[in-house]
């Protein structure tokens, strides 16, 4: 690569895309990498402020930005992602299907600390739809040493930095608890809310019951849902507070399920319970009343991970404290907001 005056560039091969920016009109490459400069191009180049140009001068020890972006893209990409054509030295990845985005933050920081290169991603543990943008990759200079890119590739290993996990759970049970609902004193308005949320992920409710605040009944219903009705996840509503009549946490514990956490540093949703039942680790969740009336709660944060069979730990739930406060915005933009970005 060498630098020459634009007026002297006729017949030279451009090393990179040249971008024209007109506010509110366009931001695109007016000439692409590999273009052979023609006499009529000179006025156009000068009009976009290019009085000097980098033109190609072969050097086998260096990689062009487009080729380096391809390496960074390969470091990130898994099988459920589509890549954009390289443009202005940048490649972007988009979701090829709905799923849960996972980001290896440790290795991502390694790449971005290496110098002269960058990968920018969405937050990990974010639910995404088909076509959603996931990341962008490029190097900072126009050229970079081949050896440097090879070292980065070797350090990152064979596992992609990004994973897009499909939603595997398709069948759920909803157990509404509470004497007031069981005896018909009030209508069960919790179950329809959960059915609507589950439908967003194409999850079918295969078993639903309204139960009294009797631990033995709730325990039996959880086991029936899993062992007889084929539920791959059980949602228990109500009975999650410290009131003497609220017995749902005890009922879940009595199934023998492994309790991950009773309580979460998230508002709304502090009285949330997460557990896993049996060898297949079927998720059994205790949902506080806020899930019924608040637009977004801890349930919305945990649900995509549960559906993707991505086991949640107590430490990860604890990490939700930073960013765990929903601001209850007048217009909700979740997940395109700061809520739940702590893990």
Which sequence ranges carry the predicted segments?
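Short, low-complexity N-terminal leaders and the immediately following helix N-cap/first helix
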Residues: 1-88
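Solvent-exposed alpha-helices and their adjacent loops that cap or buttress functional pockets
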Residues: 7-11, 29, 83-86, 126-128, ...
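C-terminal terminal segments
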Residues: 29, 85, 100-119, 126-129, ...
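Residue-level recognition of short, solvent-exposed, well-ordered loop/turn junctions
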Residues: 32, 38, 43, 123, ...
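Flexible, glycine/charged-enriched surface loops at secondary-structure junctions
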Residues: 55-56, 81-86, 144-146, 204-208, ...
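Extended, charged alpha/beta regions that create polyanion-binding interfaces
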Residues: 59-167
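Glycine-rich phosphate/diphosphate-binding loop of Rossmann-like nucleotide-binding domains
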Residues: 158-213, 217
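Short glycine/threonine-rich loop/turn motifs
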Residues: 179, 206-339
């Amino acid at each position: 690569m060498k630098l020459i005056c634009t007026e002297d560039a006729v017949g030279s091969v451009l090393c990179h895309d040249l971008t024209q920016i007109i506010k509110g009109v366009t931001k695109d490459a007016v000439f692409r990498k590999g273009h052979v400069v023609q006499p009529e191009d000179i006025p156009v180049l000068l009009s976009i402020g290019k009085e000097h140009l980098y033109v190609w001068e072969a050097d086998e020890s260096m990689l062009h930005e487009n080729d380096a972006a391809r390496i960074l893209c390969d470091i990130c990409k898994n099988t459920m992602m589509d890549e954009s054509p390289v443009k202005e030295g940048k490649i972007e990845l988009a979701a090829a299907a709905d799923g849960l985005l996972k980001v290896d933050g440790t290795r991502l920081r390694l790449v971005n600390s290496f110098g002269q290169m960058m990968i920018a991603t969405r937050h990990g543990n974010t639910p995404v739809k088909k076509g959603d943008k996931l990341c962008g990759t490029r190097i900072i200079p126009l050229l970079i040493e081949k050896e440097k890119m090879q070292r980065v590739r070797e350090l990152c290993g064979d596992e992609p930095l990004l994973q897009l996990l499909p939603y595997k759970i398709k069948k759920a049970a909803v157990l509404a608890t509470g004497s007031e609902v069981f005896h018909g004193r009030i209508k069960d308005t919790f179950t329809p809310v959960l059915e609507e949320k589950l439908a967003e992920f194409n999850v079918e409710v295969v078993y639903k019951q309204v139960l009294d605040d009797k631990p033995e009944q709730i325990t039996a219903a959880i086991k029936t849902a899993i062992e007889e009705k084929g539920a791959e996840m059980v949602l228990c509503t109500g009975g999650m507070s410290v009131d003497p009549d609220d017995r749902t946490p005890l009922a879940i514990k009595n199934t023998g399920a492994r309790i991950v956490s009773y309580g979460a540093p998230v508002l709304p949703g502090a009285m949330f319970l997460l557990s896993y039942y049996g060898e297949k680790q079927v998720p059994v969740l205790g949902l506080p009343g806020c899930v019924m009336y608040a637009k977004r709660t801890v349930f919305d944060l945990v649900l995509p991970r549960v559906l993707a069979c991505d086991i949640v730990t107590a430490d990860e739930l604890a990490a939700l404290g930073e960013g765990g406060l929903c601001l209850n915005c007048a217009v909700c933009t979740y997940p395109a907001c700061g809520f739940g970005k702590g893990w």
